[in-house]
Regions:
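N-terminal catalytic cores of secreted or lumenal carbohydrate-active enzymes
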Residues: 1-146, 152, 170
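Catalytic-core region of carbohydrate-active enzymes that cleave or remodel glycosidic bonds
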Residues: 119-122, 126-129, 147-152, 156-208
Length: 208
């Protein structure tokens, strides 16, 4: 979002950090499409959504499967488990969750690629909890279509994001009280923050 990033935290460092603090890692990978918001800072290409060419999706999906094998594979029996062991971590990380997509527009381009990735993961690693996305907001077309896709595929969990005003949070403390807890798809709140016009932080946003 326009600020400096060292790019010094890779999967290995992230997984080790989670291990050190006793947290479950949740790496999030692109669903075969780029974030439509990533080019909005002075770049006129922002707001569009392309997709990895279908001819390259097989290789991209294999990269995702390789990451799971790298995290969980046996150090002696698997290619990527051996790579992990040679890097200094012979014990598997026991990865349980993997996110596919983040605040994406739920278009035909997205749905086709997400479905391919989801099915490939479930086929090879049926125990893996795939966390999907239902768009950038908690309402609107992408939210509705994202939930439709999650219900259709039986996605175990979706990541909902909330960037709202202090008043919204105060008036929606019971937001999930009526959530159908018998649904197969559960909700993970991966991002939330209170914003006022201009997105400046103050005591009001801190307290809500």
């Amino acid at each position: 979002w326009g600020y400096h990033q060292s790019m010094g935290l890779g999967y290995f460092e992230y997984f080790q950090f989670c291990e050190d603090i006793g947290a479950e890692p949740l790496p999030v990978l692109a669903a075969g499409v780029p974030c439509q918001n990533s080019a909005c800072h002075g770049d006129l290409r922002g707001g569009q959504q392309g997709g990895i060419p279908m001819s390259e999706m097989g290789a991209y999906i294999q990269d995702i499967l390789d990451l799971i094998e790298w995290a969980n594979g046996d150090a002696k029996k698997t290619k990527w488990g051996k790579v992990r062991a040679e890097a200094g971590h012979p014990k598997p990380f026991n990865l349980k969750y993997i996110g596919i997509g983040n605040e994406d527009l739920i278009t035909d381009i997205f749905e086709e690629r997400f479905t391919m990735i989801f099915n490939a993961i479930k086929e090879k690693y049926p125990e893996m909890v795939v966390v999907g996305t239902v768009g950038p907001f908690n309402e609107g077309t992408d939210y509705v279509e994202g939930w439709k896709l999650a219900d259709k595929l039986g996605v175990p969990m979706v990541d909902e994001h909330y960037y709202q005003t202090p008043g919204w949070f105060l008036n929606n403390q019971d937001f999930y009280d009526k959530y159908d807890r018998s649904k197969k798809t559960k909700v993970y709140l991966g991002e939330y923050a209170t914003h006022i016009p201009g997105r400046k932080a103050n005591i009001e946003t801190a307290l809500t």
